[in-house]
């Protein structure tokens, strides 16, 4: 059978046979979690950091991605001598369940005993159960226990990963010494949901969609998935970043396939860029996984089970928090991070809030932002001192701005 998306090598995979209870009332059996680790776990198992990936990320946070060949998505942030220093910390990153890089998801066999590449295997497809971020975190907790870690030194994540970090702190406060939610929110807004729905409708409208059974034909809904990625990618940028990188510059080389260039003899550089991003995305991601994960994000509302009171989700927490936002992020604007910080202040949590000035938009946390790196390192240094992990400072250390979220 022709496979529509490459998958990661099964080098680090944890399989647990016991059923994972899901928030929808069902369960998922024979779950596989693909993960990577960096650094060494100390004798006390007290130096472990869980890094949670963003919406379409994966476990390859610091080493080359086997599908794209590109460096890890947080290369330069995670590694020896980096802000998340693997000479000091044992760093774990797993592919969320519902994903398509080795963890159980829509592209997995219905029969968990069968390998993905078994001839004629029936995949989950659109019958894969709906998931919540809490389900994903529940599976991560199983992995952490499997690794012999009772308490994580820190949980860190940006965007969709930040939601996972918040869920960890709410669901397992005794298992998290520090949490760093970055460029994120405690719930998905109507605008967030709207952008995701445009992407989903593009996938549904692709002629290869086949009711979600495209894997039977070997023809993936590439055009629809590419458009979904293009729409989403716009939200990751800022107007300033787009103006600086592209402005109104035009390409006249006729490249880009079926585009305005063929109709009008030219194409804006930003059009070419978005088409490139869409084309690259379909080579590494699965459409059904995209649907599963975006719906999980849309249904995220940490305060919902507490009657809309976000502070109640963190009542009594001993976890230390550093909430970080970026000034030009309009996908998860600073107001969302302030909302989280205020809720934590209401329960007298140990919380620091920092807005990093940047014109790079939501994706700033993935880019070269020295101020962000200093904040991240500075907070980890302080937490390490309080936890009894004595390390020398990275790059001379840094001052962490602590403000009240008024």
From Swiss-Prot:
GO terms for cellular component: cytoplasm. It catalyses: L-homoserine + acetyl-CoA = O-acetyl-L-homoserine + CoA. Gene3D superfamilies: 1.10.1740.110, alpha/beta hydrolase. One of its GO terms (biological process) is homoserine metabolic process. Transmembrane segments: none annotated. Substrate binds at residues 229, 363. Its EC number is 2.3.1.31. Keywords: Acyltransferase, Amino-acid biosynthesis, Cytoplasm, Methionine biosynthesis, Transferase. The keyword Nuclease does not apply. Its main location: cytoplasm. The keyword Translocase does not apply. The active site is at 159 (nucleophile), 329, 362. It is an enzyme of class 2 (transferase). One of its GO terms (molecular function) is homoserine O-acetyltransferase activity. Pathway: Amino-acid biosynthesis; L-methionine biosynthesis via de novo pathway; O-acetyl-L-homoserine from L-homoserine: step 1/1. Pfam families: Abhydrolase_1. Residues 47-368 form the AB hydrolase-1 domain. SUPFAM superfamilies: alpha/beta-Hydrolases (SSF53474). InterPro entries: AB_hydrolase_1, AB_hydrolase_fold, HAT_MetX-like. PANTHER family: HOMOSERINE O-ACETYLTRANSFERASE. Transfers an acetyl group from acetyl-CoA to L-homoserine, forming acetyl-L-homoserine. Belongs to the AB hydrolase superfamily. MetX family. This is Homoserine O-acetyltransferase. It comes from Granulibacter bethesdensis (strain ATCC BAA-1260 / CGDNIH1). The gene is metXA.
